[in-house]
Regions:
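Helical "substrate-binding/catalytic lid" subdomain
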Residues: 178-284
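The conserved SAM/SAH-binding core of class I Rossmann-like methyltransferase domains
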Residues: 12, 36, 76-77, 128
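NAD(P)+-binding Rossmann beta1-loop-alpha1 motif at the extreme N-terminus of oxidoreductases
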Residues: 1-69, 94-97
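Rossmann-fold dinucleotide-binding core
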Residues: 106, 110-187
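Rossmann-fold NAD(P) dinucleotide-binding segment
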Residues: 65-125
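Short, basic/aromatic-enriched C-terminal tail that caps enzymatic domains
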Residues: 281-303
């Protein structure tokens, strides 16, 4: 398999991340993709999964056994709270010919737990930390890899134009740690900017705030950054909140009180509870003003 590409690629979970990866990889030359998703028959979600499968010519299977039979490389792309369960449900059907990669946004210790589960079967394990939003770059989104099989995994996908960097071959969890502790800054900044414009807009003070910030942090277009970040928060607040819960849990395991991580999760949950994802049809608003206007039209404004 190494160096020859991927003949049969499988996905556990076929949500947004898996769909966009499959789309990019199919267009880049992967010949066969299959997926198993526990929600494939759930009203509402099931129809979306089937539409995505049709668009990417991905075969949907009914059981984990069928997924393992139809794929050599399997990527787990489920919600963070389902990562361990997904591994446990798949491992009975894995053999030494399989490679199982976990790209879920979970803690380093959860990655280690998944690795322990998977390697019992003789299958090889790779941890993946996705270092940016998968659309619009699809499979070319930067990713960090970890695990003894990481170099082979990178080589297998290289011909498709992927951007993968191996950060460790002897320690599972390092790639996840890079992403996780970067999130303290990145998602913390999203929460800070959202809270800033929520307050500043009540006095028409945003432009002055941005100008003042630009003096102290030259090179950053703060208005543009606010437009970008606020839109992402209202569309993906729920997912971001759960990721920050994982960060907080990891910090607690290390004996560090997660003051900032927990506060960020609260603001993300607040944003998700506004229900603006549906207002914008799941698409990102172009400016933070669109978000503030939508909030003002609702009766739920209580920052």
């Amino acid at each position: 398999m190494s160096g020859l590409g991927v003949e049969r690629l499988g996905f556990v979970g076929f949500g947004e991340a898996a769909f966009h990866l499959a789309k990019g990889l199919r267009e880049a030359g992967v010949q066969r993709t299959v997926a198993f998703d526990i929600h494939m028959h759930t009203p509402g979600l099931g129809e979306k999964i089937q539409e995505r499968a049709k668009e990417t010519q991905t075969g949907l299977v009914e059981f984990s056994a069928a997924l393992a039979a139809g794929a050599d490389v399997i990527i787990s792309a489920v919600t963070a709270d389902q990562a361990v369960d997904a591994a446990q449900q798949t491992v009975p059907y894995l053999t030494p010919r399989h490679m199982f990669a976990d790209l879920n946004s979970v803690s380093p210790r959860t990655k280690q737990k998944v690795a322990e589960i998977i390697t019992r079967s003789g299958a090889r394990f790779v941890e993946i930390a996705v270092m940016g939003p998968i659309p619009p770059k699809f499979h070319k989104t930067p990713m960090l890899l970890g695990g003894a099989a990481a170099p082979d995994f990178k080589e297998m996908f290289a011909s498709y134009g992927t951007r993968m960097d191996v950060v460790s071959t002897d320690q599972i969890g390092r790639a996840a740690a890079v992403k996780m502790f970067r999130s303290v800054i990145y998602k913390g900044l999203e929460a800070l900017i959202f809270e800033c414009v929520l307050g500043a807009s009540q006095y028409g003070a945003e432009a002055r705030v941005f100008a003042s910030l630009a003096e102290n942090f030259p090179g950053i277009d703060w208005k543009k950054l606010a437009d970008y970040m606020v839109g992402r928060v209202v569309v993906h607040g729920e997912r971001r909140a759960r990721e920050m819960d994982e960060v907080a849990h990891t910090l607690e395991e290390l004996g560090i009180e997660p003051m900032m991580a927990s506060a960020t999760a609260r603001r993300m949950d607040w944003a998700a509870d506004l229900g603006l994802r549906d207002t914008f049809g799941g698409e990102f608003p172009k400016t933070y003003r669109e978000v503030l206007d939508a909030i003002a039209k609702s009766s739920a404004f209580e920052a």
